[in-house]
C-alpha cells in the first residue's frame, strides 16, 4: 500500500515563549504544499511478528534507520497490539532539516498507512495523540488542510484560506540550520499575534503582518538564506518567508514565477496549489 507524505510551509511563525519543559510555545499557520515523498508498506509472512524491515532511497537521511521517525511511528502502534512483519520503503524527495516538515509527514503517513493496511481501526484522536508524541508538528500532517498551530505546534484549529491557483517557489540552499541553535539565539515575543486574523487580510499586506520571528537569528548566521528572500521579493513575490527554522525560503506569486538562475547547490521547486 502506497502513501504520498506532503510537505508544508509556515505562513508566519511567532515564537511566543520558552516553557518549563524546554519546548517553546509557538503560533503559526501551517499550509500543505504539493511536494511529496513516497511511502510503501506491505506485509511479509516470512518476517517475525512485529519485525520491521525498513529501506530508503532518494535524498539522504541522516542517522540510523531504526531511529527514523517512520520506524518509531509504526513501533508506537505495536505498543497496543502485535503486528505482522512489515516491509517499509521510503523514497525521499522532501529534504530533511529544511523547515518543510518532511520527517514529521513521513511519520504521520506511516501511522495512517499501517492503520489502513492492517485494519486496526484506530480513531483520529488516537493517531493524533501518537503523532504529537513523535514530533511537535506531526499531528498537522494527519489533517491535510490549512491549520492554525499553537502550543508546541500540536494544538490545531482549521483555517479557511484559499490559495488555489497561486504559485509557490521553494528554494533550499543546502544549508543545515540547527533548530536548537535557532531557538537559542532568538528573543521570544511574549505574546500571540492573532495570525489567524491577520492572514485573512490581502496578501499584499502579509509582508508586515506575518513575520517569522526566527528569521533574524538565522539570517544573522546565514546571510545566504536572507539573500534568497530578498531575491524572491525582487522578482515579484507577493509574499516571501523562511519556512519554519529554515533553511528553505519560499515565495508566493499571483502569476507563474519568472525564470531565475540559482547556484548549483540550491534545490528549487516551482509548484501550484490546485
Residue ranges and their predicted role:
Residues 107, 111-148:
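Contiguous, small/hydrophobic- and glycine-enriched helical/loop subdomains that border
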Residues 89-118, 136, 237-250:
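Glycine/serine-rich anion-binding loops at beta->alpha junctions
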Residues 11, 39-41, 70, 103, ...:
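Residue-level signal for inorganic ion chemistry
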Residues 13, 37-41, 137-141, 147-148, ...:
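Short beta-strand scaffold segments in enzyme catalytic cores
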Residues 1-96, 116, 120-125, 160-162, ...:
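ATP-binding N-lobe of GHMP and related small-molecule kinases
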Residues 31-32, 132-133, 139-142, 159-164, ...:
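Solvent-exposed alpha-helices and their adjacent loops that cap or buttress functional pockets
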Residues 142-239, 252-266, 270-274:
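Conserved, helical-rich catalytic subdomain that frames metal- and/or nucleotide-binding sites
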Amino acid at each position: 500500500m502506497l502513501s504520498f507524505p506532503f510537505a508544508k510551509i509556515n505562513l508566519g511563525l511567532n515564537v511566543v515563549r520558552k516553557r518549563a519543559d524546554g519546548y517553546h510555545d509557538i503560533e503559526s499557520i501551517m499550509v500543505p504544499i504539493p511536494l511529496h515523498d513516497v511511502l510503501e508498506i506491505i506485509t511479509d509472512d516470512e518476517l517475525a511478528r512485529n519485525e520491521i524491515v525498513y529501506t530508503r532511497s532518494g535524498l539522504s537521511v541522516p542517522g540510523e534507520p531504526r531511529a527514523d521517525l517512520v520506524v518509531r511511528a509504526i513501533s508506537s502502534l505495536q505498543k497496543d497490539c502485535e503486528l505482522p512483519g512489515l516491509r517499509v520503503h521510503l523514497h525521499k524527495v522532501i529534504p530533511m532539516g529544511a523547515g518543510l516538515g518532511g520527517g514529521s509527514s513521513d511519520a504521520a503517513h506511516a501511522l495512517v498507512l499501517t492503520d489502513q493496511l492492517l485494519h486496526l481501526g484506530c480513531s483520529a484522536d488516537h493517531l493524533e495523540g501518537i503523532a504529537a508524541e513523535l514530533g511537535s508538528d506531526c499531528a498537522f500532517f494527519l489533517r491535510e488542510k490549512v491549520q492554525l498551530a499553537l502550543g508546541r505546534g500540536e494544538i490545531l484549529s482549521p483555517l479557511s484560506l484559499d490559495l488555489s491557483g497561486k504559485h509557490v517557489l521553494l528554494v533550499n540552499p543546502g544549508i543545515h540550520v540547527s533548530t536548537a541553535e535557532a531557538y537559542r539565539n532568538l528573543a521570544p515575543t511574549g505574546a500571540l499575534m492573532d495570525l489567524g486574523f491577520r492572514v485573512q487580510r490581502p496578501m499584499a499586506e502579509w509582508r508586515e503582518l506575518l513575520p517569522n520571528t526566527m528569521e533574524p537569528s538565522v539570517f544573522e548566521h546565514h546571510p545566504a538564506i536572507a539573500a534568497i528572500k530578498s531575491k524572491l521579493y525582487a522578482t515579484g513575490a507577493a509574499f516571501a518567508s523562511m519556512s519554519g527554522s529554515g533553511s528553505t525560503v519560499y515565495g508566493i506569486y499571483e502569476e507563474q514565477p519568472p525564470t531565475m538562475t540559482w547556484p548549483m547547490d540550491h534545490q528549487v521547486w516551482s509548484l501550484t496549489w490546485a
